[in-house]
């Protein structure tokens, strides 16, 4: 139960971007999510936090992001997707701290060759290490939803915009 609570809180605070000009996420049907794992030169994911771990955390049948949205939507919203990465960004974690929106942009750009963003309704970017909201260290990233960002991709000019 604790894992589910942290999963929900953590994933809802992560950077969620909707493709193209979406005004809001759908509340019914199926939403496809590209789930990007990014780490830093000085701060890699723990060895047991691999793609399988995040697949289960995001899309597993219990104590997951999928499970949360299934419950709160009364089985009206199905969240599916793929976990990509981890990708190592250029620079240390502190380079992206203090509310720096470049983390999301750099994560999308480094993953762009592996992801056709036209196949997804939303993008979630997850960082390694603690977030400032829990550590209190301003050099850590504050896990947040960026309200205004636009990122061009290599997918025929496709734009990720929120």
Q: Which residues does each predicted region cover?
A:
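Hydrophobic H-region at the start of alpha-helical membrane spans
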Residues: 6-7, 27
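Positively charged n-region of N-terminal signal peptides that target proteins for export
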Residues: 1-5
């Amino acid at each position: 139960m604790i894992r589910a609570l942290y999963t929900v809180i953590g994933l809802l605070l992560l950077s969620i971007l909707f493709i193209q000009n979406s005004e809001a996420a759908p509340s019914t049907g199926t939403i496809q999510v590209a789930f990007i794992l990014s780490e830093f030169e000085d701060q890699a994911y723990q060895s047991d936090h691999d793609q399988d771990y995040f697949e289960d955390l995001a899309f597993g049948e219990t104590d997951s992001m999928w499970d949360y949205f299934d419950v709160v939507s009364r089985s009206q919203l199905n969240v599916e997707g793929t976990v990509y990465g981890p990708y190592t960004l250029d620079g240390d974690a502190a380079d992206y701290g203090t509310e720096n929106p470049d983390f999301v942009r750099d994560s999308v750009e480094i993953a762009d060759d592996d992801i056709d963003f036209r196949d997804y309704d939303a993008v979630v970017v997850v960082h390694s290490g603690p977030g400032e909201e829990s550590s209190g260290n301003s050099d850590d990233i504050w896990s947040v939803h960026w309200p205004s960002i636009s990122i061009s991709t290599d997918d025929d000019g496709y734009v990720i915009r929120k």
